[in-house]
């Protein structure tokens, strides 16, 4: 088995000006950002703020003026046609410059460049950057909130609620040449979206959590390259912090905001200027009886491969046995674009050691030591096991003297992922979709489907040891170290704890304020 452990304003002059291509200067402009993000897709304001970095091999370089152009197409920006905004300012300001051009509407792409003068000479024009204005008004959303406002008979709602993922899908066709396509999506609490079998974007655990009574976040993606003639859009929706895991334990402290739900607009613009919008409505199909049987950040994820929907993200899938999605309760919070970079996988790291260990209920087990505390999960390569066999992954920050996991600090949190085999794995890769863990150590065990059946204890142990590979670690927006791996739009403690008595936010406030 393989486990992948993976700035002041002066006189302002605005006029049309032709871009020239001077020789490369020692001064360069780079790292163009809109609201401190690179090429963001869900800008939630018609007047965003722009900024850039000044690079030079010389000393004493001070900006004296800047020239910004903003265009409606990349070609116009490259040709120097700032049809949305063309502005030259005598100023040393290079951050938080408010857009002052034509009024921007929802679902508008903007392409921009900047050139500066400095005490050490003039820069060349920067590369073209972009931003996309999101859906600024509720009236811009055609999609309804859909899902199920109840649990299924096999699901458990108690101190350790067990609610599985909701799988939703719809098919549509397109006609004519597509100029661009943009997906606007909010899946509460978490989502993974697919178009024609391809995963949309590289974000994980999206969207970031909020106080859903005040704000609900949506993401936007450029999906132009994913759209064909016959199409399917499919979304798996997890619980996240919307449907909470311990709601019946301390309801006065742990707010439950409702059942998982989805809202989506897919805006397709054709080359002739016409638009088509695919949105969530009463025609979508839904199933709650899929492979993800349970998911939350405290307890982990339970995945049963025997319940997989083979091909459900592709057009032509037979969903006749699925039920029709219901129109569900609307969240109280205002729907706003995600004005943060989003969480992605930072890197995959090698474990420091892998040690066999005896665990009473397991056929075989190893303990993985990463050598450092991280926030993330294990990605595992499942060996040739029998249907019903379970790979269990338990997480901890410390170990006992005998090498077993020390998990007393987790209290009521299980912090455990399960993969239940269908018997046809033969080296398939798997990782949880809707949970993550704070840990240094992980105990990986194979649990037999029938505990009384005779097994060969060492049949997979050498494979466990020799093929242990890497670990997925998540990226955090913020400073390095602790801060970087503890951010999910807002600062968080490790996911399995639910108290903040140590003053983590106060202790790291200085580093947060200095983070790029």
Label for each model-derived stretch:
Residues 16, 21-109, 113-515:
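Extracellular/oxidizing-compartment recognition motifs
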Residues 1-19:
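Bacterial Sec-dependent N-terminal signal peptides
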């Amino acid at each position: 088995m393989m486990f992948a452990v993976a700035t002041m304003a002066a006189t302002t002059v605005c006029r049309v000006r032709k871009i020239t291509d001077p020789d490369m200067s020692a001064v360069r402009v780079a790292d163009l950002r809109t609201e401190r993000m690179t090429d963001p897709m869900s800008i939630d304001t018609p007047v965003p703020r722009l900024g850039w970095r000044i690079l030079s091999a010389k000393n004493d370089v001070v900006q004296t003026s800047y020239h910004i152009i903003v265009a409606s197409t990349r070609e116009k920006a490259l040709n120097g046609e700032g049809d949305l905004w063309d502005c030259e300012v005598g100023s040393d300001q290079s951050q938080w410059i408010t857009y002052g051009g034509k009024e921007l509407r929802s679902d508008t792409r903007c392409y921009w460049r900047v050139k500066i003068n400095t005490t050490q000479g003039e820069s060349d024009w920067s590369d073209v950057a972009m931003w996309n204005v999101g859906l600024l008004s509720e009236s811009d959303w055609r999609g309804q909130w859909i899902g199920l406002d109840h649990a299924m008979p096999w699901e458990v709602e108690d101190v350790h609620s067990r609610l599985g993922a909701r799988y939703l899908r719809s098919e549509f066709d397109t006609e004519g040449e597509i100029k661009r396509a943009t997906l606007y999506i909010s899946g509460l609490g978490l989502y993974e979206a697919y178009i024609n079998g391809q995963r949309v974007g590289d974000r994980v655990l999206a969207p970031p959590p909020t106080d859903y009574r005040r704000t609900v976040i949506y993401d936007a993606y450029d999906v132009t390259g994913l759209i064909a003639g016959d199409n399917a859009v499919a979304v798996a929706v997890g619980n996240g912090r919307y449907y909470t895991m311990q709601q019946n334990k301390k309801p006065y402290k742990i707010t439950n905001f409702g059942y998982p739900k989805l809202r989506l607009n897919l805006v397709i613009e054709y080359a002739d200027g016409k638009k088509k919008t695919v949105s969530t409505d009463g025609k979508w199909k839904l199933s709650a009886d899929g492979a993800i049987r349970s998911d939350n950040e405290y307890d982990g994820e339970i995945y049963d491969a025997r319940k997989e929907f083979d091909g459900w993200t592709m057009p032509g899938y037979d969903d006749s046995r699925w039920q029709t999605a219901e129109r569900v309760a609307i969240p109280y919070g205002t729907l706003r674009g995600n004005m943060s970079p989003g969480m992605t996988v930072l890197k995959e790291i090698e474990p420091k050691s892998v040690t066999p260990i005896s665990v009473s209920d397991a056929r075989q087990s190893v303990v993985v030591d990463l050598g450092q505390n991280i926030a993330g999960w294990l990605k595992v390569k499942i060996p040739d096991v029998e249907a019903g066999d379970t790979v269990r992954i338990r997480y901890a920050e410390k170990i006992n003297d005998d090498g077993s996991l020390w998990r007393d600090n987790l209290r009521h949190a299980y912090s455990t992922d399960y993969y239940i085999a269908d018997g046809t794995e033969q080296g398939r890769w798997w990782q949880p979709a809707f949970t993550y863990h704070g840990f240094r150590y992980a105990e990986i065990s194979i649990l037999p489907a029938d505990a009384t059946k005779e097994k060969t204890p060492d049949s997979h142990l050498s494979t466990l040891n020799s093929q242990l590979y890497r670990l997925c670690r998540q990226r955090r927006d913020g400073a390095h170290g602790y801060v970087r791996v503890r951010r999910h739009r807002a600062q968080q403690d490790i996911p399995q704890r639910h108290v903040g008595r140590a003053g983590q936010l106060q202790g790291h406030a200085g580093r947060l304020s200095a983070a790029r």
